[in-house]
């Protein structure tokens, strides 16, 4: 009996560009295969927990296969830390299941509400890219359902082209059913954190550059509305996993305790315009002033350090019904002026982004459409109705392209297809791979049609 589908209005986490699709929630790989077979003439895309900010997991008028019912952990090797699980397993589920045994996910983005399949398809990165690379570097294999109905076990050694086309390939080579990941051994579930408050963008970049060798995890929250001599002032947090000896005596009895929970929930409806230049300037001032000028050795929980926004359920609602656009770029080292000029334009136009994050990326990842490259990455959240937003983002596009940089496909919701080739030099390789493994174009999304992927 075919798996039922039902019409559902979908958006990305940014809540822009809603479309209707026929959504199914298969319980196992056989049901996924049946859905793909039945949808050959309509088109299909996989969807996890819906944390892509854009329409990467939307498929207007077509079929969306939601994998969140497929969340079994299939095996674990306590010697190597390799875990095999279904694609719908979330990073939070892995943390909850394996932190008590001393294992953590190798790479975590800013939310733990991401499925393993989605983490591979977006090749997500975290605060440790300079030391650990992106998520797919820690994947040893995955089972991929391709358009011909076959299930292939793909490894970087057996099928490198398909592996690195799928990692960062936004779900367009097939549906990931299962994956094997190498977890990271940790002694505690706490982070030993150092904090520095910087005065301007020069000090911020200098401190970030000096931090790479000493910390596994580093990030800067940046005040995007600061001007003049305070342009780019930031609060930098850097950390490594704590040892048992680093903990307070009372916490040493349960060094691997982990109890994730959202503290509060955002109301179903927030008024439009609550996030604006005036409120963000006030929030930025408070956030900056409350940070210590310098503090070392603070013990933080995983939730506080890695996923502060997960403490608010549906935090995306605070931007109002119009939603928000996240804009994230990376430019090569040597293009520091692009970051400076970006902040100058943002502050001049008073474009409000409270969640403004600056990081350094390490060695580039092998994925054909993987986002990271060695350089500076800046991420910004703007209310969708921000005045002059289209003009501002077009100006930032020019700066990024001129420096040989790129935008993140898991977040972009607006660039035209002609910008893809200069940003992603292996786009032609990806298109050839898609033509080979999916000649009829069974897999597709609103994102892939916009960008001609």
Task: Kindly give the residue locations of the regions a language model identified.
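Noncatalytic alpha-helical scaffold of FAD-dependent oxidoreductases
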Residues: 1-453
